[in-house]
Structures are given as C-alpha cells and as structure tokens.
C-alpha cells in the first residue's frame, strides 16, 4: 500500500517568489499529488484554489506561524479553508515559546484556543515538530506533554522525521507511537557527521541562534532516499499508523544542487518504492 505524496512548498520558496504559477505547474509535472503551503506569496485564496484545480494538485495543509494564528485565527482558518486545505499546522516555536521557558504553557494554551476555532470550521490542526520539543520535563518529552495536554480530536501530529532523528529518537517508532493521530508525515532526509548536532543548526534553515557554526560538512539536508533515514521503514510506519499523506520537505538543497532538482530526486526515489 502507498499513500499520496505532497510537497511542502517551502522547499521551493525562491522559485515560487520568482514564478508562482510556473513553479506550481512544475511541482505537478514532477509527480506530486498535493501541496502543503508556507505562505501564499501575495496571492488570493481564490486565485490559488483556481490554479490548483486547473493543475490537479490537492491543497493538503498549510504551515502558519503560531503568532499569526493567535492574532488572526478566524481570518487565516477561513482563508485556507477557502483554498480547500484539510489541515493547518503549527510549524515552529520561537525561542520564547519553547519547552523550558515560561512561554511553553502559553504555547499550549494558545494551541488549545486555535484548535477550537479550527474544529468549528472543519479544519484539523497539526503540530509540526523540530528537535527542541525532545527536551524532557519531569522525565517526559515536551512533545508528548503537548499531545497529552491537547485532546486528540483537537490536535494531531505532523511528525517531521528528520528532526526526530536529529533528536536521537527513531522516526518510525515515533510515528507508530501516535497511530491514529498521525494523518500527515513529513519525509525529510539528512546527513549528520556525528551524534552531537551543531548548536547553530537552525542557521541552515535561515534562523539565527547561538553556539558553534553549522556547516554542510557536519550537517546537511538531503533528498529523500539520499541520506541516513530508513525511508522504507518510515513509509511502512506511516501506513500502519493510519496516515493519509506523506509530505516531502527539504529546507535547503545540498551544496551544488538546486531546490527543484532536490524535490525531483525525492519524488523519483519514492516512485522506485511504488509511491
């Protein structure tokens, strides 16, 4: 059994900025079944929906910054509902909202409020993890605390398999841990020289932080199937957990590669597995 494959459009953000329509058409040509948004690049919901309908891509989900969702909950939920998205995902936590800070309780409270609005509008809210949620609080990972604090019918998982691996956990096992609550799984491959991740790892996705420099020699994102991940096991786990979609994401191409070629390689690899 295989699942439909979507592309997180953040992977080709520069191409979208330069030519939104042409890039969306190219994504379809590469064999993707759907897309996950990370912004609309100034386009209206109606125009985006019309383009996707014409091209034949399904609008799966949208990554929307948490603070934006807090400030404009109804507006944003209705905008992505108009496009046809089934899901909205909280994509990232700023440092003041992360586990280990006073802001984490506020994060959980805000997610609960947003989840209620999503449910009222027929949208399913997801949480997309990184590695910082694998900080233990009273012996329990913060990611698990979040999912225990918010009811399953209000918040579901969008397990990012790269960041689970970077955190030192098994991505397949984590997907299976949330069987029945894992409708969308992020397929992301990577290379990491050692088990000790660079402190400035997030600079590779455009976010400044303290610590040592992160360099391609020590860590880098890779097309799906070209890194350290056991992708067949991850795909099997996704099916077993009841996922509806898998989403390819590559934050940054490997040195010498391009974003579009990277997502092309990912899609071609998945096709070799019958996906």
Roles of regions detected by a PLM:
Residues 13-18, 34-47, 64-73, 95-99, ...:
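Acidic-and-aromatic substrate-binding clefts and catalytic sites of carbohydrate-active enzymes
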Residues 120-228:
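Acidic/histidine-rich catalytic cores of soluble enzymes
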Residues 226-239:
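A short, acidic, amphipathic alpha-helical segment used as a generic capping/interface helix at domain edges
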Residues 36, 61, 89, 126, ...:
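Conserved beta-strand positions in the central sheet of alpha/beta enzyme cores
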Residues 34, 66-157, 166, 177, ...:
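Active-site acidic/histidine proton-transfer and metal-coordination neighborhood
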Residues 1-87, 156, 236, 267-275:
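N-terminal pre-domain/capping segments
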Residues 243-273:
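C-terminal/domain-terminus segments
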